């Protein structure tokens, strides 16, 4: 069975580095990002214009490479979680996860029984993997073990509940949503404000206490380095569009002298 490489690295205490995509639709984006050296990429269905048919081919292609494909779904919903996993996603990232009940529902939707209530399915791309197991129970247990579940923390309510959220069995990562958190705190765009940083530190500390990984998704390299130094281990840098824009400007500046 295919190993979820970033989940394994996180379990081993290692840091993993990824990028979010919002415009790329060609399946080769997976291989391009793999060649660039990323551990994973995240398909953004919350803010970008992807639907289920758009992401299916990208997810299938990614499974032929060594990069891990994660999907940020639009909201916590059984159909989004189960169908995206059935299409080949190795991780589910849920935005605006604020409560313990929502964390438990994410686990219920994303895991087969007895850990959850995900409906049994063996998609075509998993047929060979299924044949590796004599017992169905062993197969479904293995799939559960390789599924990464990410709760995005981006409100004052979520910060207040973060210790309990990260204590939920099956939640692997608490991912910061710094922009939305700063908005909710009345400090829009001030990710480095002392109050915002203190709130983010609560997430890092809760994850450390409960044996989970913490992460962040922001464009600032210096900020990401700071939080890596504080113990964050799932580092999602910006978007593929920003990468192209920034590199393009850099190259043109050099060419024009």
Give the positions of each predicted feature.
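Conserved N-terminal beta1-alpha1 strand-loop-helix module at the mouth
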Residues: 1-69, 76, 108, 149, ...
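N-terminal amphipathic alpha-helix/helix-capping segment at the start of soluble metabolic enzymes
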Residues: 1-20, 133-145, 201-202, 208-209
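Hydrophobic faces of well-ordered beta-strands that scaffold small-molecule active sites
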Residues: 16-21, 41-43, 69-73, 92-94, ...
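Catalytic cores of alpha/beta
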Residues: 31, 71, 76-90, 94, ...
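Alpha-helix-loop-beta-strand connector modules within alpha/beta enzyme cores
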Residues: 52-86, 108-116, 141-144, 192-215, ...
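C-terminal helical cap(s) of enzyme catalytic domains, especially alpha/beta-barrels
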Residues: 58, 100-116, 228, 241-257
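Conserved anion-binding
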Residues: 79, 91-169
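Glycine-rich tight-turn/loop motif centered on a GG-T
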Residues: 89-91, 112-125, 184-198, 238
């Amino acid at each position: 069975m295919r190993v979820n490489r970033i989940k394994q690295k996180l379990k081993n205490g290692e840091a993993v580095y990824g990028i979010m995509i919002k415009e790329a639709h060609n399946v080769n984006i997976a291989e391009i990002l793999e060649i660039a050296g990323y551990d994973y990429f995240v398909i953004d269905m919350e803010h970008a214009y992807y639907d289920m048919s758009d992401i299916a081919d990208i997810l299938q292609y990614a499974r032929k490479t060594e990069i891990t494909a994660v999907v940020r779904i639009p909201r916590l919903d059984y159909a989004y979680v189960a169908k995206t996993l059935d299409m080949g996603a190795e991780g589910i990232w849920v935005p605006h996860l604020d409560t313990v009940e929502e964390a438990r529902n994410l686990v219920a939707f994303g895991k087969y029984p007895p850990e959850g209530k995900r409906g049994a399915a063996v998609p075509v791309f998993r047929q060979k993997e299924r044949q590796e197991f004599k017992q169905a129970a062993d197969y479904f247990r293995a799939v559960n073990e390789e599924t990464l579940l990410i709760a995005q923390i981006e409100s004052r309510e979520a910060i207040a509940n973060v210790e309990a959220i990260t204590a939920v069995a099956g939640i692997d990562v608490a991912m910061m949503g710094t922009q939305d958190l700063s908005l909710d705190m009345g400090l829009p765009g001030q990710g480095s404000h002392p109050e915002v940083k203190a709130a983010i530190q609560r997430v890092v500390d809760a994850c450390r206490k409960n044996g989970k990984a913490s992460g962040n998704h922001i464009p600032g390299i210096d900020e990401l380095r700071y939080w890596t130094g504080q113990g964050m281990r799932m580092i999602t840098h910006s978007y593929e569009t920003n990468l192209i824009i920034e590199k393009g400007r850099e190259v043109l500046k050099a060419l024009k002298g």
